[in-house]
């Protein structure tokens, strides 16, 4: 229990004790003893002349019998009581109520209101001076990081080497400022970490705290603003006063966009409290008073909404981008998290990194944890590559729906659909290496073919885009070849959407259409409120764009059809294997098409290593294929 809880409990116990004490004395004063009789018995004794004397105090009557015994009774409103007593020769003594009251009780009653007010005043004064902070709204909520517990250092941070290098310089400055001051350098006043969620901004701040060996205060941007006017500005002042008293030190503000948004844009219902808080922060960071030795590090994933005055040099001298890691960064991050679990030699961080493009550090940590949970649920002693693959598919596509009731007809159709994707991907030029194919339903998909690029692709050429379109259309083509045009299903809707997006990007953004040319078509400005941008393309040009998109998709469709028609036997073999095994790795598919057995010992041990064993001759691109077909027709 904290100090505030103990203080409230003490005051409550004292109040209850006083009330009980008051009741005890009041009861004792009213009854005066335990020999009580009813008023009817008292009147009977008076009429029988057995009562010698009575002492009346208010409505309480204390009587003495002729034999010397005493008794007590309580009298109602009885006007003839005195006449009845005198007529029966009873001696009467009337005592005022005040003379019988206990001295301590009288003192307590007279002084209790004053004592209560004094006690309440003392209680709140103690709280305002830091006892429980009942009224300390203006106190900063910045928490000083404790030295107890395991420290996080830069060794625990991987995949963001550039950001680590920038922040290491700040840590070195705090440790030995003379090294930089000899050359006239000044300590940076602020550093802003910018990046999407989960990339490690807060982890970097914790690593700085573990490396710097200086006081480290942490606070959230939402901790400044409350319902009371002026509280936010007061907390900012108190936070910087704490920093000055502990300089050199670091103050970390997480999610600074909660308090640092643009001023005067009319958002937030016209609340000026947040703007007052921001103004005070601007003054404290770079005003008339210097804050030597106090370094502000802030983190946000919304730099576009921050006020410009907050971003200028002198306040945040450095803006460090913490982006999602590339393939090498993902591999390093996976190795850091794999150290925390038990795994065997089949787990290859590089393969996992290739299959998780765009993953943040937090998502990779979650993937490793999911793999450990899956292995534990299956009763394994170590995590293997199968568990990592299952965890990756679960994160990307959802939980496997093995309980779904698929008919043999649907299962066969799905096998040919996914087999078409896989086969065209093997023969298509510039297509990424095939990783695996499965017909196990996950999420909204009945199956999946996964291709993993060797490295992260930041741009694509025409050949790569055309290959991707052909692979997208291959599932629909396989359904049409095997089951006929009238039996084609809606399962290829997402494939058609993906192919259309690539084709439209080729025409309107990449300038890869000879008819349209290298001209950008689309909105040249982004709307911060999420509204649909206006169309800047004429109707005539839009018709040409649609025609070009259709032409590119048709070429990819025909190219995929040529491959599947030419290798129809391999399509049947692959589809039958998928029906039997449900999931095949890229290596297993290559072994199958080359006539090798699927259940070799090496393949079962390392099913997802992607080691090439056979060479697949790539077909010509759609443009070259169309040209060759035209020449053969002319001949």
From Swiss-Prot:
GO cellular component: plasma membrane
Composition skew (Basic and acidic residues), residue ranges: 615-635
Region annotation Disordered: where it falls in the sequence: 600-635
Segments traversing the membrane: 7-27, 104-124
InterPro entries: AAA+_ATPase, AAA_lid_3, ATPase_AAA_core, ATPase_AAA_CS, FtsH, P-loop_NTPase, Pept_M41_FtsH_extracell, Peptidase_M41
Membrane-side (Cytoplasmic) residue stretches: 1-6, 125-635
Listed name of the protein: ATP-dependent zinc metalloprotease FtsH
Organism of provenance: Rickettsia felis (strain ATCC VR-1525 / URRWXCal2)
Gene from which this protein is expressed: ftsH
